[in-house]
């Protein structure tokens, strides 16, 4: 009897191990701007919130961060970055899309996108992802840090976040409302308490900004971790209404959350430059 129990237990363990090894990996692609993008070491402590995401998932989840500094939906598409991303997407994958900071920058004509074109670009992205049998996830842009003299929070995105919400509603797309969650987070932190989350660096602290900088758009590691956590918490909440998110939620882990690089920037840029010569020129203009 004892031998039979041992044999049965061994068989169960073997079956579980075999099943786990056969489990299909889940891929997440990130498309966005500098607030999401991976950063090279020279830019430290500037950090994109996309850098935190791999730590939230187990090894069954593979993340490719295609977000790049200075990109709007228009330039991300025109430089061939979107086509390159889509060429790597397969059925069952997920594509997280967060743009808006550069689209609404009227003072920067090289990246500005009209509201009408912004909405059309998001619709194109959603359509392209679905055509590959993958799941699009739209994110409203995270908030910049701005408070008035009375310590009231000031939104700077205008109607662009509402256009993301409109596309999500009209096309029945999963929406992660990063604007609302990040706004609530910054208001709770307050005028002074929120400084530590953004790229306020002293002279000599950052190689990229040797004279120092007060930047209320880009994140420090503390800010990236906070925004990454907001994304994951909302993802878990939204998954209650969207069962297609089950592969992501079931692969979340409870380990220590830390910063990481999903795919080295130079490696992914090399891959992309082999498919589109416009990428290098676009990279120079965005620096």
Where are these regions (language model features)?
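Bacterial Sec-dependent signal peptides at the C-terminal "C-region" and cleavage site
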Residues: 3-4, 9-25
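Extended, non-catalytic scaffold segments that flank or surround catalytic motifs
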Residues: 12-13, 28, 148, 156
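Serine-esterase "nucleophile elbow" of acetyl-processing enzymes
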Residues: 22-68, 83-91, 287
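Acidic/histidine-rich helix-loop elements
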Residues: 37-45, 67-76, 105-113
